Every structure is written in structure tokens, then in C-alpha cells.
Regions:
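A short glycine-rich, Lys/Arg-flanked "PGG" loop and its adjoining helix->strand segment in the class I
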Residues: 120-132
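Conserved alpha-helix/loop element of class I SAM-dependent methyltransferases that forms part
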Residues: 18-37
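A short acidic, Gly/Pro-enriched loop at the edge of an enzyme's catalytic core
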Residues: 95-106
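Class I SAM-dependent methyltransferase SAM/SAH-binding core
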Residues: 41, 47-96
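A short SAM/SAH-binding and catalytic strip from SAM-dependent methyltransferases
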Residues: 106-117
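C-terminal alpha-helical "lid/dimerization" subdomain adjacent to the S-adenosyl-L-methionine
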Residues: 18, 137-193
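Class I SAM-dependent methyltransferase Rossmann-like catalytic core
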Residues: 2-22
Length: 198
């Protein structure tokens, strides 16, 4: 689901970037540890802040990333043009990832799957494209946060089949992931790292 105009502003500003750098990345690193090189995928890359973090903080050698919105793809490509072959950005859909099976050492979700109407399919696709033993790093917002009347009025999110944090983690284990670590935050969402069975 594409972001509305207000949510694009909220997700593509220095405050959101600082939140990713100083809260999300450190939490996910604590739960899942760094990568030892390898190729990572970011689903819903927006303007490309997550790509920087995956390379510089998590230690991926290369990042492939996609977004549903062509405008965000253009911004991310511009932001990372100097990185050459280390970054590839394209249009894509998390519920139908265009990659071969077992391609990635890690997949990153910085608050994207709650925008995906078929989020369960997206988890299945993430599992499919991860190598055995590969890790899925996710920061997600749960149903309770999205039910806030102000959020409901101003921002567009799928209304059907929303998840709470336990349900999100449960779907991961149902898809043959093992949880490396999880931290719920105030019942509004949280951080989870899960590994695909080897």
C-alpha cells in the first residue's frame, strides 16, 4: 500500500532518520548482532536511510532494496549513486519479492509490513529469499498503535488482518523461523530478529 502525502513527509524527514539511526538500528543490533558481510535485502526502503545503516552499522557487503513507490526508488537511487555495485534499488512488492530462493544473508524491515495488506504472504516471501540460517531484522508497529483515532484519520493503513506483536512473532515461528530476540514496546509494536532454520 502506497503512503499518503502526510505519511511520506513523516517517513522522509530528519526526525525519522534519527529514530532509525539511534533507536531502531541499535535495538536490532542488540537482538540479532552484526552481519559478516554478505548480501542483504531491505523491503520498503523509502529514501534509503536503512540502506546506509545496513551497510555501515550492520556490516553487509551489498544491499539490494525495493519500494512500491517509484518516487522513493528514485530518491534512494540518487542517495546511493556513489556506492556503485554495493547498492541496487528497484520497484517491488514485499508480498511478491522478485528474487530467487535463498539469495540473501539478511532481510530488513524498518516498519513496512504493517503497510502490506498481505503481510503473511510477505513473511513467506522473506523466508523464501533468505538463505538457511539467514536473519530477518524487523521493527514493526502493531494494531493497537494503528487504531489510535488520530492515526486512523490521518494515515492510510490496511484495515483487514492487522497484527499485534505476539501475532507477528507467531507468524514467524509458524513459517519456520526461530526467534533470536524480540522486544515489545508499550504494546504498540516492537523489534524482532528471527533466523531461518538451517
Amino acid at each position: 500500500m502506497l503512503l499518503n502525502r502526510l505519511e511520506k513527509v513523516l517517513m522522509n524527514n530528519p526526525v525519522r532518520a534519527a529514530f532509525q539511526r539511534h533507536l531502531e538500528a541499535p535495538q536490532l543490533l542488540r537482538l540479532g548482532g552484526p552481519l559478516a558481510g554478505g548480501v542483504a535485502l531491505e523491503v520498503g526502503c523509502g529514501r534509503g536511510v536503512g540502506i546506509e545503516l545496513i551497510l555501515e552499522r550492520f556490516g553487509a557487503e551489498r544491499v539490494e532494496a525495493f519500494d512500491l513507490d517509484p518516487q522513493m526508488v528514485a530518491l534512494a537511487r540518487r542517495r546511493h549513486a556513489s556506492r556503485g555495485d554495493a547498492v541496487r534499488v528497484s520497484e517491488g512488492d514485499a508480498s511478491a519479492i522478485e528474487a530467487e530462493d535463498a539469495r540473501y544473508d539478511a532481510v530488513f524491515d524498518f516498519g513496512i509490513l504493517h503497510h502490506v495488506p498481505r503481510w503473511r504472504d510477505a513473511i513467506g516471501e522473506i523466508h523464501r529469499v533468505l538463505k538457511p540460517g539467514g536473519r530477518f531484522f524487523a521493527e514493526e508497529v502493531s494494531e493497537r498503535a494503528l487504531e489510535n483515532p488520530v492515526i486512523r484519520r490521518l494515515l492510510d493503513h490496511p484495515r483487514e488482518d492487522r497484527f499485534d506483536f505476539d501475532e507477528f512473532c507467531g507468524e514467524l515461528t509458524a513459517r519456520d523461523f526461530s526467534l533470536c530476540g524480540a522486544r515489545e514496546v508499550l504494546g504498540l509494536g516492537g523489534f524482532v530478529v528471527a533466523a531461518k532454520s538451517a
